[in-house]
Amino acid sequence: MDTFLFTSESVNEGHPDKLCDQVSDAILDACLEQDPESKVACETCSKTNMVMVFGEITTKAKVDYEKIVRDTCRGIGFVSADVGLDADNCKVLVNIEQQSPDIAQGVHGHLSKKPEEIGAGDQGHMFGYATDETPELMPLTHVLATKLGAKLTEVRKNKTCPWLRPDGKTQVTVEYRNEGGAMVPIRVHTVLISTQHDETVTNDQIAKELREHVIKPVIPSKFMDDKTIFHLNPSGRFVIGGPHGDAGLTGRKIIIDTYGGWGAHGGGAFSGKDPTKVDRSGAYIVRQAAKSVVASGLARRCLVQVSYAIGVPEPLSVFVDTYKTGKIPDKDILDLIKENFDFRPGMIAINLDLKRGGNFRFQKTAAYGHFGRDDPDFTWETVKLLKKA
């Protein structure tokens, strides 16, 4: 049998880049909650004892940026310098200006345009992907790596493994076979976990508890065998972590946010951006389109691309590839996609309810993936059944 190996990684919410994504989206949530027409492009960076938020925000909302930064860091678990950051005592720098009037007039006419007239906030191309290899219609490598990271955080916060600290990374290699273009997982080849820990714990205890409390509950036993390789904290020591260990920046984990290296990526990040930014809204609608194609039984695997020009509502192009798994020709699937999905940014915002903030709506997306999540706030995961004519 001809097989191949493919690998996806994830990082959990205490990773410095992911901390920054969550701060940027917490600010977006706060703006949209009070003013759904907020225009937000919020970046965050972090290093030892410092978090800085900067960018362009035009909003009627009254937002305490410093409080949001501290609350977000505290919620992740950064409560003292020795775990990587002290939420209550670190420096918080804010450098936020209004959206450029040039962009405002071109995209939304200073809020005067109707939803169907709103132009894309920038040029760019975005990809959506779906595959029938998991119930989530997501790649198994990505699903397992992401769930391992989420489980690490769970057992840290519920004190099952009190020696854990917030920062951590996971990686999963799966052996696959190609079944006429569809991806069929056979077994998990390698599991890698590197997690921050306190000084009291031994490497043997780390490995034993990670197997018991993190790996065993997440990876189905049918995918494990006696040849599965485990690398558990292979560097030997990971006490210094979070922003103390490495600088963090919004938008540095775009593959973890999406499909773990499968499909394709146009390069635009999601966090801290309101829905006029097609980097985010465009990627969400093409995920819904690709997922709907697979869920409707029209293909076992699907990639959809959309592209935009700044200030122009209609997409420049829409592309579909079913990797030769389509039950009908790709051009017919493309016609169905165009009939069933409105790719104009103003309409995406309405149809996917993307102007609604608050309740951690977007902050939730900023750790453990934007896709394949079972949560009603993830409106782009709703399947539209597509019928071939």
UniProtKB/Swiss-Prot annotation:
Record: residues binding K(+): 43
Annotated Pfam families: S-AdoMet_synt_C, S-AdoMet_synt_M, S-AdoMet_synt_N
GO cellular component: cytoplasm
GO terms for MF: ATP binding; metal ion binding; methionine adenosyltransferase activity
Subcellular location: Cytoplasm
Keywords: ATP-binding, Cobalt, Cytoplasm, Magnesium, Metal-binding, Nucleotide-binding, One-carbon metabolism, Potassium, Transferase
InterPro entries in the cross-refs: ADOMET_SYNTHASE_CS (IPR022631), S-AdoMet_synt_C (IPR022630), S-AdoMet_synt_central (IPR022629), S-AdoMet_synt_N (IPR022628), S-AdoMet_synthetase (IPR002133), S-AdoMet_synthetase_sfam (IPR022636)
Binding site for ATP: 15, 167-169, 235-238, 246, 252-253, 269, 273, 277
Cofactor(s) annotated in UniProt: Mn(2+); Mg(2+); Co(2+); K(+)
A Gene Ontology BP annotation from the UniProt entry: one-carbon metabolic process
Domain of life: Eukaryota
Binding residue positions for Mg(2+): 9
Catalytic activity line of the entry: L-methionine + ATP + H2O = S-adenosyl-L-methionine + phosphate + diphosphate
Protein residues bound to L-methionine: 56, 99, 246, 277
EC number of this enzyme: 2.5.1.6
Record note on cofactor: Binds 2 divalent ions per subunit. The metal ions interact primarily with the substrate. Can utilize magnesium, manganese or cobalt (in vitro). Binds 1 potassium ion per subunit. The potassium ion interacts primarily with the substrate.
Pathway assignment: Amino-acid biosynthesis; S-adenosyl-L-methionine biosynthesis; S-adenosyl-L-methionine from L-methionine: step 1/1
HAMAP family reported for this sequence: S_AdoMet_synth1 (MF_00086)
Protein family per UniProt: Belongs to the AdoMet synthase family.
Role: Catalyzes the formation of S-adenosylmethionine from methionine and ATP. The reaction comprises two steps that are both catalyzed by the same enzyme: formation of S-adenosylmethionine (AdoMet) and triphosphate, and subsequent hydrolysis of the triphosphate.
Matching PANTHER family: S-ADENOSYLMETHIONINE SYNTHETASE (PTHR11964)
Designated name of the protein: S-adenosylmethionine synthase 3
Organism: Vitis vinifera (Grape)
Gene for this chain: METK3
